[in-house]
Amino acid sequence: MPTAVQPDPPSADDAFYVGYDPPMPPPIARVVRRAVWLAVAIGVSAVALVAGRHRAIAGGVFEFGNVQPVTGVVVERPYPALRPRDGRPAVLLVATGKHGAAPLVRGLTDRAVSVRGQRISRDGNEMLEISSIGQNASPGDAPGGAPGAGVVLAVTLRGEIVDSKCFLGVMVPGQGKTHRACASLCLRGGIPPALFVEDRAGESRLVLLVSPAGEAMDPAIVADRAFEATEMAGSLSRADGWWVLRTDPATWRRLAN
């Protein structure tokens, strides 16, 4: 009669596990635990490395939903602004969305008003997205005339044409090629155009762009050049706390990005 052959007892290498049939055999459990801890360690290290190499995105502040009043005298040209009574720099005015405020302040030049809106600010430059305007004084009650412009300098500047609303804080980042389509629409809608310039020391300035006669720029012209590196010459002055460049678009020169 043949002798029955007894199978060898199972070893640790023979462990087999089906995911829906617990418990997990100890040898497999040990391997899984090690793999999980290794994955966690790699993940934490990757997050720390990415965070350490992250560069902060420059931008301003948009106080969305915080409607507050600002009083002052309306300036219609070249771009709508409010000159505060306390002598602080003028606050540029814009409408909601991608629209300038020219239709909202038409006929209110030198009128003292109270404007309710949402503040937009960056590096000391302020803007207000208008919610409502209430006239609270007659022309005769308004504060004195506009502060005189500072020294006029003949300059040649290099920088990028930006829409001031997004750049000052409505969008972060509000500059660069990824923002070009949005900026073009804002400029066509009447948002004041500006030139963002940086000097060799890394100091940056926002310069409002106006025509040689000191009037608002043609929206179509600046919209077509949104966020293009551009060289432009003109007369630079300081007015109402803002840098302003009178320049002829016909003399502008595109620069290689």
Give the positions of each predicted feature:
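OB-fold and OB-like single-stranded nucleic-acid-recognition modules
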Residues: 2-257
